[in-house]
Swiss-Prot record:
Species for this entry: Cowpox virus (strain GRI-90 / Grishak)
Record-given protein name: Envelope protein OPG155
An annotated GO cellular component: viral envelope
Keyword Transmembrane listed: yes
Family membership noted in the UniProt record: Belongs to the orthopoxvirus OPG155 protein family.
The keyword Disulfide bond belongs to this UniProt entry's keyword annotation: yes
Subcellular location, record wording: Virion membrane
Any Pfam family hit: Pox_A28
Transmembrane residue ranges: 1-21
GO process terms (BP): membrane fusion involved in viral entry into host cell; symbiont entry into host cell
Post-translational modification: Contains two intramolecular disulfide bonds. They are created by the viral disulfide bond formation pathway, a poxvirus-specific pathway that operates on the cytoplasmic side of the MV membranes.
Length: 146
């Protein structure tokens, strides 16, 4: 064996040892890793400290360009009437006669998700927290879910 062969054997042995050490480290800390992931799962697609948005680019949705958590659209349980889509901007709205707006309600969570995150741009928004109805029940509910 020449010196070059010995050098490559030493490098390969060191690399294999490092892989075993990393594997053992993951094995020993697996419970802590799962706990960390569960704790920070809510921040998976939020803006990172470095300023680069961490986005799920596989599916385009309305929350992809938003980094403020309160501005992100979400489906929440509406008291007694199914589900609604809400954000700091208000609720997804249904436009009735005379251009009156009311909260769009869904029977199931899946219907709410399908409507909120569909490819169609939903621009009808009803915000119950604008004057003069700042203290109504709908505004209080919106503030409570944000």
């Amino acid at each position: 064996m020449n010196s070059l062969s010995i050098f490559f054997i030493v490098v390969a042995t060191a690399a294999v040892c490092l892989l075993f050490i990393q594997g053992y480290s993951i094995y020993e800390n697996y419970g802590n890793i799962k706990e960390f992931n569960a704790t920070h799962a809510a921040f998976e697609y939020s803006k990172s400290i470095g300023g680069t948005p961490a986005l799920d680019r596989r599916v385009q949705d309305v929350n992809d360009t938003i980094s403020d958590v309160k501005q992100k659209w979400r489906c929440v349980v509406y008291p007694g009437n199914g589900f609604v889509s809400a954000s700091i901007f208000g609720f997804q709205a249904e436009v009735g006669p005379n251009n009156t707006r009311s909260i769009r309600k869904f029977n199931t969570m899946q219907q709410c998700i399908d409507f909120t995150f569909s490819d169609v741009i939903n621009i009808d928004i009803y915000n119950p927290c604008v004057a003069p109805n700042i203290n109504n029940a709908e505004c209080q509910f919106l503030k409570s879910v944000l």
